[in-house]
Amino acid sequence: EYLPIDTVYPTFNNGYSKVAKSGGWYYVLTDGDVSEYSDEDGGLAYEGDVYFDFDVENIFGDEDGNLYALGNSGPLVRWGTEEDEVLLNYCVMVSLHPSGKKAVGWSYSNSITEYDFETGTNKERVIDPVEGINSVSVTKDYQAVCGYKESETLLNIYDNNWNEVMTISSTDTESGMLEGVSAFEQTQNGWVIFDSWMENVIFVGFDGAILKEVSYEELFGTLNWPYVNGTCMDEEGNVIVAITDQREDNSCYETIIFKLKGF
């Protein structure tokens, strides 16, 4: 389902737009700026901008209605608290748990850092199956690490205690290709995997069965060089997707938002 935005967000940076849902509000990040939207008549109505004293690289929402913003190499702050509470001063990349109580940080080696904001502790962990990490996603019950070993891309899925659940490689997919997992979400029926290098969405059951692969063009009606790099879950269990797609006149890219329902 396409969610029209009543403001247009042209951008020359493909693949950097993000979306978060928190406290009944939508937040959209484009080119370092964050805007707030309400849900109105099946679309998004602009309510105002959210200001930070740094360029924002990513945004997250938690189950308690808080909004978080991550700067370039830090900081990670909780917005709306006094002076925007700083949770991490320095971090290259971070994925926040939906509770807001913990997060996973990583760079491009094969090690990650687990952050526990309740205890103020952190722990290093090596992801042995890969030589380097491309992305990490944290959902309610799972953590997904997309990395590479030699020339092969691997998606390793773990539970909250870092017990390995399964590994997906290119040989497991219908297309025979798995290149760059840019987003990963957990629904009531399984996992939704966005491979923006191949422009595919892969639906996987909790039993590990790959149920369906659908192209971005087929699912979203995208045009040229579409890239999904921002997703979140709403309160009803739908996947909210921020995608950048090239305009028909090739003048620039534009941030568009979809709601993925039914899985």
Which residues are covered by each model-predicted region?
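A short beta-strand motif characteristic of beta-propeller blades
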Residues: 2-10, 43-52, 82-88, 121-128, ...
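Structural signal for glycine-centered tight turns and loop->strand junctions in beta-sheet-rich domains
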Residues: 23, 32, 42-44, 65, ...
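Loop/turn-rich, solvent-exposed surfaces of beta-rich toroidal or solenoidal domains
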Residues: 176-203
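Conserved beta-strand positions in repeat-built beta-propeller and related beta-rich domains
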Residues: 20, 27-31, 38, 61, ...
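Short loop/turn segments that connect beta-strands within beta-propeller blades
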Residues: 39-42, 79-82, 116-120, 159-163, ...
